[in-house]
Amino acid sequence: MRRPKKYEAGEATQYISRRAAIRKLQLSLNDFRRLCILKGVYPREPKHRRRAQKGSSEIKILYHTKDIRFLLHESIVWTLRDYKIFAKKTSRDRAIKDFRNLKRRLALFPEIKLDHIVKERYPTFIDALKDLDDCLTLLFLFSTFPSLHLIPREQSNLCRRLTIEFLHYVIASKSLRKVFISIKGYYFQAEIKGQKVTWIMPHYYPFKPQSRQEVDFKVMSIFVEFYTILQGFTNFRLFHGLNLAYPPQFPSSLLQDNEDTFKDEASFVSDRIAALNFELLRTDKVQEDEEEPDIDMELLEQDGDSKRIIKMKQEAQEVSRLRTLFKGLKFFINREVPREPLVILIRSFGGKVSWDASVFPGATFAENDETITHQIVDRPSLSTQYISRDYIQPQWLFDCVNQRQLLPTNDYFLGETLPPHLSPFVDSKRDSYIPPEEKALHDPSLIETHEQSEEESEEDEAEKEEEEADQELLDAQLQLAYQQETAEYKKYGGPDGVNEDEEDLSEEDDEEDDDEEDVDKEDVDEQTKRKQQEKEKMSVQSGKVHKVNKRQVHKAEVDEHRLQARMVKPRHRNLFRKLIREKQTKEKEEWLLRKKRRNIDADTKEAKKAAKREARKLAAEAAARAAKLVK
């Protein structure tokens, strides 16, 4: 039997370097990257790098050998090889100025078809929905880009069309569940076929060119090339699930014979589709309530009243109320407010919305409509206001959706300081730090209170002393006023003016009070005797206070942690270290957040103190002026 040589079996044969993979596939580096992105093949990290690299200590990019064998049978490899031949032939035609032949070759440009790759990577529709988060986020980002060297205009337009179609589905199915505004953009989460899909819609900022060292647009463009095919398949399936015509179309009643539709019907329809403010054409007449069947309550009742079933019932009831949250309300969006995110919010929950017709086509009613209930404004004041509507800031809509109820509009009026905008994506089970506002939202009795430091307690004592001094000053003033009144009474009425009958009555009252006091003292003495007898019968001893030594407690915790680390098996030590590191980073983040919160509370407290001092100063000055005027 032949003895196997070193690196002929085991981990050395499981991995292959990138250079060897390129040589095996006969592709260039750019084509190899493109193929790996489209097929979902990515580098691997071996357990023992030196063994995987056949004794070499140099750090190389490694792939699984079976993944490279898998790429050998891909039909796209032949298309990528055809690109080389196509480039050589077209360059030759340009050199000899054979433009007739060049035109013929350009018409036969080899195109890559990715349909079979999408079906291969996502065997079921649910698998595609699970991987839709990154897809939507990247498509929304590319839909805002202008025409660049590596991003053609057609690609940006395609991203814009696919994202608008997906938003139409979200509005029609009323599947939006959570929203949040952050520095990155607008976070949205929809529930589609039981899967939670989260994406980011970027803010409307002017495009800033980036260097190649910061952002590689070529690699991102390859991802977008695959994601556009995936999103097209997904939109087609979602639209047909709701009996909506795909591509999106409008009913014939909307396409009236006016000048706009007569000039260019295609641009008219595309503008109205982008407005997100009109119902789409359906293949059959199905009511909106029948689109997404709710959970069968009768079926749940058969399973008993377990905690899980009760929770599912409550969630189903909340979702049914949430889908009609803005029903019966009419909103008007001011010019300075971003239109698209708010239109998605309002229409997803049953509301009606419009805006200024000069901002974007698709407005359904004007600003002077008396039936408008809310106007969304993001400026400190307005010149003209209507009494019949509430003027609110955009955050009100997001907070209403996250709390699943219509909140009072008092805190969101023009010029008001907005309440904190809480994230709905916080998991109370996983996240250690929860803001006190969120705790108070769920349970008012769980408002977070941090332990006061010595400085804070000293400040509180100083405040109390100031208040006591003010109170003493006020009492002294009242005492002085009382003395002045009594002096005036003696001056005009005199103490001799008191009747003798009244003096007799007062003496009789004093005698009665003395008798009552004697009786009360006897009762108190009897009660104390009884208590003393009861105490003698009881055998309760006084307890001792044990002081906790913090140093010993900390030492015991450290020893326990070391013992726990020793008990971990050698193969699980890296995992144990990773878990401990994650725990430490979480604790550090929590400590930093609590520290920031304490600083914010201290600043607000100091501001309130300064306001109080200013108010006292103004009151003292006003009192001094009044005293001068009286004199």
Swiss-Prot record:
Q: Name one GO biological process term.
A: maturation of LSU-rRNA from tricistronic rRNA transcript (SSU-rRNA, 5.8S rRNA, LSU-rRNA)
Q: Source species, please?
A: Drosophila persimilis
What lineage is on file?
A: Eukaryota, Metazoa, Ecdysozoa, Arthropoda, Hexapoda
- Which InterPro entries does this one have? BRCT_dom, BRCT_dom_sf, PES
Which residues fall in a compositionally biased region of kind Basic residues?
544-553
Q: Which SMART domains match?
A: BRCT
Q: Where in the sequence does UniProt note compositional bias of the Acidic residues kind?
A: 453-471, 498-525
The residue ranges of the BRCT domain are 321-414
Q: Can you cite an annotated GO cellular component?
A: nucleolus
Q: What is this protein called?
A: Pescadillo homolog
- Whether DNA-binding counts among this entry's keywords is no
Family to which the UniProt record says this protein belongs: Belongs to the pescadillo family.
Alphabetized, the UniProt keywords read: Coiled coil, Nucleus, Phosphoprotein, Ribosome biogenesis, rRNA processing
Q: Which HAMAP family match?
A: Pescadillo (MF_03028)
Query: Chief location of this protein?
Result: nucleus
